[in-house]
Regions:
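Glycine-rich FAD pyrophosphate-binding loop
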Residues: 21-40
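Dinucleotide-binding Rossmann-like beta1-alpha1 core, especially the glycine-rich loop
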Residues: 43-122
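Helix-loop-beta segment of a Rossmann-like dinucleotide-binding subdomain
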Residues: 76-88, 113, 120-158, 284-288, ...
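A conserved short coil-to-beta-strand element within the FAD-binding core of flavoproteins
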Residues: 162-176
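Flavin-dependent oxidoreductases
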Residues: 179, 183-274, 289, 293-294
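C-terminal catalytic lobe of FAD-dependent flavoproteins
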Residues: 266-268, 274-280, 286-372
């Protein structure tokens, strides 16, 4: 069968991956020359430990398995099974970590509580003060600015994949797409993975779509000059992800309120090392549109302060700063908004911040539901 996929970010590319793997022919359209949205502006952090119990955790675990398989087939993805650490310093933070490793599903999440020496064995670059750390062994990273393009180049070698950049799809019906150059692309089925683009065609097809947009700010440093052995999060991550929530996080919030800057910007601090040695650090979360177009310095100052406290040393110079926008379902329980808009056309959007982690499993499930 011939499958049309719209959107060249991680979500669209993973749908194309599974379609080609199942023997189908794929035409892949992207309105930009190449992906420029959230997939290439994020951490490349494949997170399992923080996911909500049930469907989301299962999707993240399967997504991580698939990323490892894809990384083995496509080295340019840069898959690294490095795990992640959340260093803790206070009694309230330690209580959260202990509660999490005592969960009934802690093994599924790969959780372990490490003492300070064990944590620094995993990541010797952590020279700041810490008492212990929550380790999530199943977490991994990929290279976000390279991964989707590397997968697309690999798919092109199959002889059953065609990428068409600079083509905005303006009409979709019955498996046929019309782009803004007036060309029609006929397929047996079409999957629209348009990311944070929720107007135009998407609004026409699904005007009541329960999805919002979220804006973030991030930065990347020059090379650190040493191996940063794991991904790292500060303890604001306990406040942010539903998979960590419980009486223990309520106690943390009561005993140790979040820093005012972090609270006002919806922040946690995540740090992931890139293949060139630089550190990707973020992020903020803004939910009310219209979004500012400025990059504000207050959250960057907070990120720098937290990162330097974890490292116990100054950060390397900042190489670049940027903002990104992703689509998130208003109801956090479904992993993604998946809607059949006609007999041959499906719309898949709104995975939120779990898009990079879960895209491979989301694509797999979509094709299963389509009977492909």
């Amino acid at each position: 069968m011939r499958i049309a996929v719209v959107g060249a970010g991680a979500l669209g590319t993973m749908h194309a991956w599974h379609a080609v793997a199942r023997g189908h022919e794929v035409v892949h359209l992207e309105r930009e020359p190449q992906a420029r949205g959230a997939s290439v502006r994020n951490f490349g952090f494949v997170q399992v430990g923080c996911r909500a119990e049930g469907e989301e955790l299962a999707a993240a675990r399967r997504g991580r398995e698939l990323w490892e398989e894809i990384g083995a087939a496509v080295p340019g993805v840069g898959f690294r099974p490095c795990g992640s650490l959340v260093p803790v310093r206070t009694d309230a933070e330690l209580a959260v970590a202990k509660a999490l490793v005592g969960r009934h599903d802690a093994a599924d999440r790969g959780f372990a509580l490490l003492d300070a020496d064990e944590a620094r064995t995993r990541n010797p670059a952590l020279r700041g003060a810490l008492r212990a750390a929550l380790f999530a062994e199943r977490d991994a990273v990929v290279e976000p600015r390279r991964a989707v393009r590397a997968v697309q180049e690999h798919l092109a070698g199959s002889g059953r994949y065609t990428f068409l950049g600079g083509r905005e799809v303006v009409e979709a019906a019955g498996g046929t797409l019309r782009d803004d150059r007036g060309e029609r692309h006929h397929a047996d089925a079409a999957v629209l993975c348009t990311g944070a683009w929720l107007g135009g065609l998407v609004r026409d097809l699904a005007p009541d779509l329960p999805v919002r947009r979220v804006r973030l700010q991030m930065m990347q440093t020059e090379p650190l000059g040493e191996d940063f052995g794991t991904a790292v999060a500060d303890t604001d991550t306990f406040r942010f992800y539903p998979g960590y929530a419980g009486p223990w996080t309520d106690a943390l919030n009561a005993e140790q309120p979040q820093h005012p800057t972090a609270a006002s910007w919806g922040m946690q601090t995540l740090i992931v090392q890139r293949a060139d040695g630089g550190l990707t650090i973020g992020d903020t979360h803004a939910y009310d549109e219209p979004f500012d177009f400025d990059l504000d310095e207050a959250p960057y100052a907070h990120l720098t302060e937290v990162a330097e406290a974890l490292l116990g040393r100054p950060l390397p110079p900042v190489r670049r700063r940027w903002a990104g926008v992703y689509a998130q379902g208003l109801d956090p329980r479904p992993v993604v908004q998946r809607r059949r808009v006609d007999d041959r056309t499906w719309l898949v959007t709104g995975p939120g911040g779990r898009g990079m982690s879960c895209s491979p499993s989301i694509g797999e499930t979509t094709l299963d539901e389509m009977g492909l």
